[in-house]
């Protein structure tokens, strides 16, 4: 009878452990940033952002050169001008500096907004692809492996790239 009890307890323990193991969540991982950078849409968006940035940079550099030229001219002519004229010129230069600073801030804001608007649909497409592949393969959780110290489980990168045809 004692052996039967031990056998029953061992069997119950085994069944419980097996149930626990099969009840474990299926976990996968993917480096989302690497996936996004591999997407052709990302490369197109980055090229557009860089082009816009260079346009702003060219305009800013031209304005800086104009300001420097005007400063040199006004400095060279300062001795021959009246105090009133020099004060007027200083106000003009200060106005130009303020305008340039405002333009730089607006350019930075426009670039950030453009980047957000271009990347948002790309990130959404990557998220949807990851979700579709994970669901198709029965995964309950997908972690971004860029933030993990140790990534065990299936890496979905190859499958998601195949899903996106990249």
Residue map of PLM features:
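Amphipathic, charged alpha-helical segments and their helix-to-coil junctions
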Residues: 24-166
């Amino acid at each position: 009878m004692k052996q039967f009890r031990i056998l029953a307890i061992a069997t119950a323990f085994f069944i419980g452990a097996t149930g626990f193991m099969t009840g474990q969540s299926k976990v996968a991982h993917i480096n989302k940033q690497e996936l996004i950078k591999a997407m052709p849409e990302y490369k197109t968006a980055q090229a557009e952002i860089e082009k816009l940035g260079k346009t702003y940079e060219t305009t800013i550099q031209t304005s800086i050169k104009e300001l420097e030229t005007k400063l040199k001219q006004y400095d060279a002519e300062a001795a021959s001008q009246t105090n009133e004229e020099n004060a007027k010129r200083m106000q003009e230069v200060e106005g130009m500096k303020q305008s340039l600073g405002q333009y730089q801030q607006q350019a930075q804001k426009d670039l950030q907004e453009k980047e957000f608007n271009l990347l948002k649909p790309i990130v959404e497409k990557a998220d949807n692809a990851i979700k579709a592949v994970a669901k198709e393969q029965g995964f309950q959780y997908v972690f971004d492996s860029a933030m993990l110290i140790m990534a065990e489980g299936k890496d979905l990168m190859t499958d998601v790239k195949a899903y996106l045809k990249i």
